[in-house]
Amino acid sequence: MKFDPEKIKKDAKENFDHAWNEGKKMVKTPTLNERYPRTTLRYGKAHPVYDTIQKLREAYMRMGFEEMMNPLIVDEKEVHKQFGSEALAVLDRCFYLAGLPRPNVGISDERIAQITEILGDIGEEGIDKIRKELHAYKKGKIEGDDLVPEISAALEVSDALVADMIDRVFPEFKELIPQASTKTLRSHMTSGWFISLGALLEREEPPFQFFSIDRCFRREQQEDASRLMTYYSASCVIMDEDVTVDHGKAVSEGLLSQFGFEKFLFRPDEKRSKYYVPDTQTEVFAFHPKLVGSNSKYSDGWIEVATFGIYSPTALAEYDIPYPVMNLGLGVERLAMILHDAPDVRSLTYPQIPQYSEWEMSDSGLAKQVFVDRMPETPEGQEIASAVVAQCELHGEEPSPCEFPAWEGEVCGRKVKVSVIEPEENTKLCGPAAFNEVVAYQGDILGIPNNKKWQKAFENHSARAGIRFIEAFAAQAAREIEEAAMSGADEHIVRIRIVKVPSEVNLKIGATAQRYITGKNKKIDIRGPVFTSVKAEFE
């Protein structure tokens, strides 16, 4: 909290030790629910795929490549030009774009009656306005998402009524079936490179070195641990009169060495795609130390990571490109799986989707989900709670019956004396579980004593909820005393006995933690004999 520096300097000159010790009063005492680890500074994290993309961008640029964005939507005729006789096989794996046709809607007398019933009497002029707007929509002058607002503005009626009118009067809009176009979503980055390079030659002369990292789409039969229907391709091209296969090898090593790969093996690719010159299509295998001994088929450290080749003159000629072009491509997700030690591309890409990944919640995360339910709402109430805890710490082992005054003052306009009591004989002021602390340990949430048996559980301070049973009970007692003061009671006693569930000691566990613990077959074990009471006497 804020303080007066001049007063502090004056007090320090008079009595330095006293002023120094008084400094504790300047530091706010957090409430139980404000304590660490519930008070935390969150930080953002990059998605592993986007993190890998950024690293690839930097790696390419360090090698002197310039970034380019290639067309994502490619007409099927481009695929025929690039792939020749392979085009149909390639198109079989492409997603075609489709759109809803725009119906030619008529307005009969029956429909006019329905419109009038919904919108009221808008007259012939209003019907004509609807006709004009529908005609403009049919001609493409109005976009689909603007049709309702346009009719609404023309008729000066609400959007909701117009939407209801279209839904009930014009069923044609609900019966529309998408019609496929000849445009596809790019399945290979190559589809975009031919278009970009052909256009660029009209304005610039090679040599060129470009890279592009962007989405591609493939109509796979199904997605599995190693393939998705949409993925990122990190592709580059070198256009130069003297470019050779060796440039592909050099780029492979230069790029992949920046990601920890140490050895390289180049093998002719058996696929022999028609857009590459025969015998230039090459698979790149690389050795990465992180893979050695892993639980994967790459435990020997070797993995196929890229493919390169020289574009075929027959494909380049379709775009009037007279220069050789070396192209290299690699899947970003495969590289990300190596860098982030991920066994499944689905869980790597979509970790938020339960069907793709195991839910893992840290002990620290579980501890953040433990809260005190009822808290005092006044400064005096907070003082009462602290005083109750202090008396229990001082006299918890005292034999009963016993009573210890804890706090005296005014609460909600009424004077009150607060004591910690244990009226029963042959016991103690506090039961043996009173000072148990809530800790998350190995996926469980436990209420346990801080002793040698549980030393391992208490070593991780970020997994300690920072709440003892007696503190949670004292908070409840203080809140009840505040309520008793406002209700006009003369006396109020708050008791706690054997705790069997968190709510009996004024604790609540967040719903997220409860779902996690239930799903993982873990446990919430907060129980034990607390046995103490707090008495408030009002004047």
Curated annotation (Swiss-Prot):
Keywords: Aminoacyl-tRNA synthetase, ATP-binding, Ligase, Nucleotide-binding, Protein biosynthesis. Substrate binds at H188, M189, T190, S233, A234, S235, Y275, Y276, N327. One of its GO terms (molecular function) is ATP binding. One of its GO terms (biological process) is translation. It catalyses: tRNA(Cys) + O-phospho-L-serine + ATP = O-phospho-L-seryl-tRNA(Cys) + AMP + diphosphate. It is an enzyme of class 6 (ligase). HAMAP family: Sep_tRNA_synth. Homotetramer. Interacts with SepCysS. Catalyzes the attachment of O-phosphoserine (Sep) to tRNA(Cys). Belongs to the class-II aminoacyl-tRNA synthetase family. O-phosphoseryl-tRNA(Cys) synthetase subfamily. This is O-phosphoserine--tRNA(Cys) ligase. It comes from Methanosarcina mazei (strain ATCC BAA-159 / DSM 3647 / Goe1 / Go1 / JCM 11833 / OCM 88) (Methanosarcina frisia). The lineage of its organism: Archaea, Methanobacteriati, Methanobacteriota, Stenosarchaea group, Methanomicrobia.
